[in-house]
A protein has these predicted regions:
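N-terminal glycine-rich FAD/FM-binding segment characteristic of electron-transfer flavoproteins
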Residues: 1-339
Length: 339
């Protein structure tokens, strides 16, 4: 066991995989840099951003401004867009050479593909969809995530293996304020690819031309649950949202019923949101839903059941029938906003 302990001491610093698409750094990477900064400060270590892409080095300074001390940049045609094998090879090489203590990855479609590959190749643990990350007294990473269908929060530790790896959904962590004066270093990496393992080639990318709204970006959300009932009920929520320049979102029940699309779902199996104002309309407040919205700045809940758990997190609660309350609220807000 002494060898394990000796081994662990060789690993240090908090690394963040910086996801980029079409040369644009994704918001989840900026959020993870904010969390990495907190973790590294409590360990007295550095934050290292790992940026993979092609002709992408100009993004390094932005990563320093958001909390990175070092940016490792691999600039290669092989990395122009995400393909599993080249990306997995590149990061595996970085980890073997640099020995990070912690690696954080966004739980996006890319991160969910990359994380398990790295975990297998590096023979270390991976905790997916973490909602909390902290450092223990033993300097281990405490990774908290919902377990047993979200009815329990489990804190997981990767005691004997390094790096400690975690994926985190977009919107869960808070980004740091951008500081243009932060100083950091940028290092260009040379990746030795084993191209014989490259089995996949991207021939074409076809983007879905849909007028999709990203509810994680909304300042005000009007969210409907089972109590709203049907499409007609959601049309009333749309009206209410219109008076506040808000977006409409929903609980899982309404997505399962086919009334709302999945990209509007708030909760553990949907999106995590932090708007300034969140209306929970006819939502009882299952723990899975709360996990996706309880960090909202101000929560207004309307529910017929005065014992509904949603009232435990609401700043303002109205016990009443959503179908009656929403039109009254819409009328009142429309009058106020006209003023």
């Amino acid at each position: 066991n002494l060898i394990d302990i000796m081994d662990k001491t060789q690993y240090k610093d908090v690394y963040v995989f910086v996801e980029q698409r079409d040369g644009q750094v994704q918001k989840v990477a900026i959020e993870l840099l904010g969390k990495a900064r907190e973790l590294a400060d409590s360990l007295n270590e550095k934050v290292v951003a790992v940026l993979l892409g092609y002709e992408i080095a100009d993004k390094a300074q932005e990563l320093i401004a958001y909390g990175a001390d070092v940016v490792l940049c691999a600039d290669s045609k092989e990395l122009v867009q995400y393909v599993t094998e080249p990306y997995a090879q590149a990061i595996t090489q970085v980890v073997h050479e640099r020995k990070p203590s912690i690696v954080l990855i966004g739980a996006t479609t890319i991160g969910r593909d990359l994380g398990p590959r790295l975990s297998a190749r590096l023979e270390t643990g991976l905790t997916a969809d973490c909602t909390g990350l902290d450092i223990s007294d033993d300097r281990d990473l405490l990774m908290t995530r919902p377990a047993f269908g979200g009815n329990l929060m489990a804190t997981i530790v990767c005691k004997d293996h390094r790096p400690q790896m975690s994926t985190v959904r977009p919107g869960v962590m808070r980004a740091k304020e951008k500081d243009e004066n932060r100083q950091g270093t940028v290092e260009m990496l040379n990746i030795n690819f084993d191209k014989s393992k490259f089995k996949v080639k991207v021939l074409e990318t076809v983007k879905e031309q849909k007028n999709k709204i990203d509810i994680t970006e909304a300042k005000v959300l009007v969210s409907g649950g089972r109590g709203v009932g049907n499409a007609e009920g959601f049309a009333a929520l749309e009206k209410l949202a219109g008076t506040l320049k808000a977006e409409v979102s929903s609980s899982r029940a309404m997505v399962d019923a086919g009334i709302m699309p999945h990209d509007r779902q708030v909760g553990q199996t949907g999106k995590t949101v932090r708007p300034n104002l969140y209306f929970a309309m006819g939502i009882s407040g299952a723990i899975q839903h709360l996990a996706g919205m309880e960090e909202s700045d101000f929560i207004i809940a309307v529910n017929k059941d005065k014992y509904a758990p949603i009232f435990n997190v609401a700043d303002l609660g109205i016990v009443g029938d959503v179908k009656k309350v929403v039109p009254l609220l819409t009328e009142r807000l429309a009058a106020l906003t006209k003023k």
